[in-house]
Amino acid sequence: MKRRVFLGLPVILGILFYIWYIFHASDNVAYSDYIRLVNSYLPDVTNPAKFFVPDILTRVPITYLGRIINVKLFGYNTYFDMILGVLSLGAGAAVLALYAERNRSVGYLSFLLIQFVYFSLNKWEMMTNGTGWVCTLSISGFLFHFAVLDHAAATRCRNMSDRVLLAILPILLVVLVAGPYSGGYAVILLLAYGALWLADRRGGAETSSRSWSRKCRRTWCIGALTTVLAMVLYLWSNSQAVYVHRGAVTDVSIAQEFAAQPLFFLRFLLKAVASSVIGVAQIQDLEAGSPWFVRLHLVYLLALYLNVRFQLYKKTIFPLLLVLSGGCNHLLVLAARWIFLKDEYGMSSRYEIQYQMGIVGILLTFALVWSVCREKAQETEADKAKTRVPEKRAARTLLKVCMLAFTVLTVFGNAWTTRAEIRTAPYRKAYLQVSRELGLNYRTASDEDLETYLHNDPDAVRDAMRILEENHLNIFR
């Protein structure tokens, strides 16, 4: 009970910290992505014709419910969406706390450091733009699904609740919540289910109960099938959508662009990985292109190696799933954003919540490896002779130094970013207060000011402000 309290306390404090931050760094004003949403869905947010469209899954159905509640009860207040984002972020932190409760190898200090990184302000752009709450909810949903899968694998699928959740979570997440963000999630799940099925198939004769082995394989198959079904539904819906990429500077294929300038893609990935450790502004101060800094991407490979070398996957697959998800998310962002031909595009704060899965997985891996090393150090010499890891002492020391160095760098980088964002918060709020005044005076404001401060086409801004004014919503409430 005491451990649960200690594990839950950082989650609550992190939520309260983010609520404090958004009220000091943001304001209730519809701008940027909100302009498109206002013009598309308001004021008749309950109109079925706007809901039942061929590309409904790309529009994320759960956002319709959130929009209805916001308009009907809160007058379309952007703080409502931001609070949803904070609570969604807290849900992911709660999943990490649940995992730490189940896996006592994660020490409390390691857990605190992970929570500190998790609640850092490197995600400020996503959290202060209320429309991003569904992305945060999606990531937390993925964390929950991975935690359920980890528990099911560790307990041989003995819990009915685990089996049911593994069957229905892909449908709930992909169809209702996470459609646009579910590509990497689905790939990692299918790889995990395939590996688990093969492991059970190969080791079935050695298990204490063959019936449980068959039940596990059936659970993995059902989970994989529902994942494929959910993705087929989403991809069909996505095929009906029409996308407009504002700011895209090329129309050639990714293969042609890679052949023309392969180093661009490498720089894109390296800078994106670096941004998940240290904030964008701080990276620019440190000149992220330096040879020392780009080596950060090797930590992903180190984490994968450690999961295999110490056979952590036999006890828990959760950290490995997170590491793979983080790496996959980097590739997906590259695949979606390379068309802008800006190698710093992947460093945007809006993607940090997706990258952070990998960082959390790396830190969890290090925590578990550190626990294994500590246990071996406490064994008797006779036990060491039977179970020791074959690395030499120098190699083990080097490994510990590398893990400690990355952990310190990650904590320091996120602390630096958070400190800088706390100092910047009043200026961000002041900027949005100017945006609010321009929105209130949209009829007389210049096109340049509307585009600069409300981050959208001036005509679209005026149309959106007119809708809000006529219905007494948002800044006109």
Where are these regions (language model features)?
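Transmembrane alpha-helix segments characteristic
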Residues: 14, 111-118, 222-232, 313-339
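Membrane-embedded glycan-lipid processing machinery
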Residues: 28, 80-84, 123-134, 347-351
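Membrane-interface alpha helices of multi-pass inner-membrane proteins
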Residues: 160-193
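Intrinsically disordered, polar/acidic, low-complexity terminal segments
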Residues: 2-67, 71-110, 161-162, 191-223, ...
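Transmembrane-helix signature of polytopic, membrane-embedded enzymes
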Residues: 100-121, 139-140
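Specific aromatic-rich, kink-prone transmembrane helix
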Residues: 113, 134-157, 190, 358-361
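Hydrophobic/aromatic-rich transmembrane helices and adjacent perimembrane loops
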Residues: 127, 134-138, 343-368
